[in-house]
Design a protein with these regions (language model features):
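Hydrophobic residues in well-ordered beta-strands that form the structural core
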Residues: 91, 116-118, 240
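C-terminal helix-rich "cap/oligomerization" subdomain common to oxidoreductases
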Residues: 1-2, 65-67, 290-334
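A contiguous active-site-proximal alpha/beta segment in oxidoreductase catalytic domains
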Residues: 73, 96-158
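Beta-loop-alpha module in the N-terminal Rossmann-like domain of NAD(P)-dependent dehydrogenases
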Residues: 20, 49-108
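N-terminal Rossmann-like dinucleotide-binding module
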Residues: 1-47
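C-terminal glycine/acidic-rich active-site capping loop/insertion
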Residues: 121, 235-303, 307, 329
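Rossmann-like dinucleotide-binding domain that binds NAD(P)(H)
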Residues: 155-224, 228-230, 307
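Short, Asp-centered acidic motifs that coordinate Mg2+ and/or phosphate
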Residues: 34, 65, 145, 213
């Protein structure tokens, strides 16, 4: 918890901004001093907290930090204004609308030595945090594959990016995070089925530098809302459902056979299933606590760095480029 009461601001009061406002108003050690959005406060998220018309008005109040939850197209301009004013920022994902913009944001904050982070919220999901800890402890043995499914109905809140940058960035980031590896290459196909200008479906095949194969299915076309990550390894598989924050382990069975013809071709068999008991705190609250602590001087707070956010944008751009060209796109390792 913060040693002092930090004064926080918020830019963007839309579908995601309202949740940030709710958390900020209840966050220990933090006071939400104002929210800025030229479009008003359509969800009434601020309550009695003042609403301002723009980021410049918010900067004039000299907040200790600002949360950026405006549309992706404005992330760069808002972030650069905050960096110029020496104000730390928690920026919603994706970091920026393209790679050059993301690089400019990284440079602006790093060159000034400012605390800044990207809101890749899945890193704070208790199911994925538990999965990552267990993978690091070697409970699955060698990891072979990561497969994710993230689908649901079209969200009216999204207008300036497609499903790759809005949703698939979750899976692209979490895959590298839980495995501790980087994408070496990606191949992708996209579709436009809803009549909107951006893609609403993507399937991605990726290879990580560790040799792990990744598969991602993401769309805005399904009546079924699903958020599932499956990691398969030599001892079985973990399944994380980030909607319910449940983590389940399916162990490989060990069934002996004396039938040589079967034994020679036998693969894995189904073993025990374990559903872990995990404390289930809201990921957005944990994300805010983590950033608050970083602003307050905690060196190992566990924020998602801007460079990690830049990497997610780079992988997302490679996915879109592959879908356009029909070719597998390599990614430089960093």
């Amino acid at each position: 918890m913060s040693k002092r009461r930090l004064r926080a601001g918020l830019v963007g009061l839309g579908a995601m901004g309202r949740h940030h406002a709710r958390v900020l108003k209840a966050l220990d050690g933090v006071e939400l001093i104002a929210g800025a959005d030229p479009g008003g406060d359509p969800h009434g998220a601020l309550g009695s907290v003042p609403r301002l018309p723009d980021v410049e008005s918010l900067i004039a109040l000299q907040p200790d930090y600002v949360v950026v939850a405006c549309p992706t197209a404005f992330h760069e301009s808002v972030a650069l204004a905050l960096a110029e004013a020496q104000i730390p920022a928690l920026i919603e994902k994706p970091l920026a609308h393209d790679i050059p913009a993301a690089r400019r944001v990284v440079e602006a904050f790093e060159s000034r030595g400012l605390v800044a982070a990207v809101g890749h919220i899945e890193r704070y999901n208790p199911a994925l945090q538990s999965m990552r800890s267990r993978l690091e402890a070697g409970e699955l043995g060698e990891v072979f594959q990561v497969a994710t499914r993230r689908q649901g109905p079209f969200p009216n809140r999204i207008a300036d990016v497609g499903v790759v940058k809005d949703l698939a960035t979750h899976d692209l980031d979490l895959t590298g995070w839980v495995t501790g590896a980087q994408y070496r290459s990606v191949a992708a196909k996209t579709a436009h089925r809803s009549g909107r200008p951006h893609e609403d479906l993507v399937t991605v095949l990726g290879e990580l530098d560790s040799g792990v194969i990744a598969n991602h299915l993401v769309n805005w076309l399904s009546p079924l809302k699903e958020r599932v990550s499956i990691v398969t390894g030599e001892r079985g598989c973990f399944i994380a459902d980030t909607l319910t924050a449940d983590l389940t382990y399916f162990a490989n069975g060990s069934t002996r056979t004396e039938w040589d013809a079967v034994s020679a071709f036998r693969g894995v068999s189904e073993g025990d299933m374990t559903r872990y008991a995990i404390p289930k705190r809201e990921p957005l609250t944990v994300e805010h606590e983590t950033f608050r602590d970083a602003v307050d001087g905690k060196a190992d707070a566990g924020i998602v760095t801007l460079r990690q956010g830049l990497r997610a944008v780079m992988v997302a751009e490679a996915v879109l480029d592959s879908a356009r060209s029909g070719e597998t796109r390599p990614l430089a390792l960093v």
